[in-house]
From Swiss-Prot:
Catalyses which reaction(s): a primary alcohol + NAD(+) = an aldehyde + NADH + H(+); a secondary alcohol + NAD(+) = a ketone + NADH + H(+)
Record-stated family: Belongs to the iron-containing alcohol dehydrogenase family.
Name under which the protein is recorded: Probable alcohol dehydrogenase
Keywords from the UniProt entry: Iron, NAD, Oxidoreductase
Amino acid sequence: MAASTFFIPSVNVIGADSLTDAMNMMADYGFTRTLIVTDNMLTKLGMAGDVQKALEERNIFSVIYDGTQPNPTTENVAAGLKLLKENNCDSVISLGGGSPHDCAKGIALVAANGGDIRDYEGVDRSAKPQLPMIAINTTAGTASEMTRFCIITDEARHIKMAIVDKHVTPLLSVNDSSLMIGMPKSLTAATGMDALTHAIEAYVSIAATPITDACALKAVTMIAENLPLAVEDGSNAKAREAMAYAQFLAGMAFNNASLGYVHAMAHQLGGFYNLPHGVCNAVLLPHVQVFNSKVAAARLRDCAAAMGVNVTGKNDAEGAEACINAIRELAKKVDIPAGLRDLNVKEEDFAVLATNALKDACGFTNPIQATHEEIVAIYRAAM
C-alpha cells in the first residue's frame, strides 16, 4: 500500500450545544478582527448576529458578509474579500452550510495568496495557508467545514471550479447539532444524501485506505438509520446529532480518499443550471454506481450491508445491485426528485456537461475511468 496523508482540522467540536465551548476556543487563538461569512437567511434568522454578539463579548471585532449564494460564485468571493480588506480582518469565520464555508475558504485563500480565486482551480495550487478560518456548521451535510475542498461557481464559464487544496482546511470546525434543528425537510434530505454520496464515493475510490474505509462505512450506516428520522421530524435531537456525526465521518472519508464521477457530474449541473448540489448528487448516485459496479461490485456489496441490507448468500454483483436499490429506496423515502428531467436538465446540454465533468478533479479517483460517451450515457440514464 502506498503512503497516505490524512487531512483534518486540528480541532473539531461536535455535539449539541457545543458552540459555546468553540467560542471560548476562538478567543484563545488571539484573533482580534474577523469576517463572518454567511448567507442572507442566517442573518434574517438572527444566527449571524448571535455569533457577532458572542465574539464581541470576547473582545473580537467582526463584520458580516452575507451575500453568499447557494452556489457561491467568484463574485461572492471578490465581494467578501473586499470587505475583509476594508476592515483589516486577521481571520475568517464561516457560518452555515457548504456554501458559506466554500465562499469563506475562497476569501481566506486569496487574502493570503493574492490573485484571483480562479488561479487556484485544481489540486494544491496555492503557495501558503489561507487566513485562519473557523467553520461553524448548520447543516448535515457537505462536511465543507472540515475539508480541503472548495467549490466555487465561475459564472463566466458556467462551471463549478473544484479547488482541492490542503491550505483551505479550516483551523477549527464546529458541528453543534442544536443549530441544525431548524433545517427544512428538503434541505435535510438533500444535505443528508450529499453525505451518503461522500461516504460511498470515498469507499469505492482508488485512493481509499483502511482509515477512510472505516469512516465511510460507519457514515453509511448512520445515515441510512437516521436520515429518514431527521427528515420526518426535524426536532428529533437524537437523529440530528447522529447526522452531524455521520456527515463528519463521511467528510473524513472523502477529504482523504477523494470522490468520483457523482460529484464531477453534479458540479456541472450545479454550475450550468444553478441546481442544489445535494439533489444533483442524490439523483446521480445510483446511476454512477451502476457504471462503477463493473469494477467495484465487492465494495458496493459492503455498502449494501452497511445500509442494513442482508447480503448473506449474495455474490458481489448481486450485492452491488442491492446497494443501488437501497440508495434508490432511501432517496425516494426522503422525497428526492426521481430524475434530472424533474430538475429541467436538457439532453442537448449533455455533451458540454460531459466534457466539463471529465476535467473535474473529483473524477480522477473514480474506480473506473469513463469515456465522454459513457458520461453522456449516465446523464441520459439519470433523466
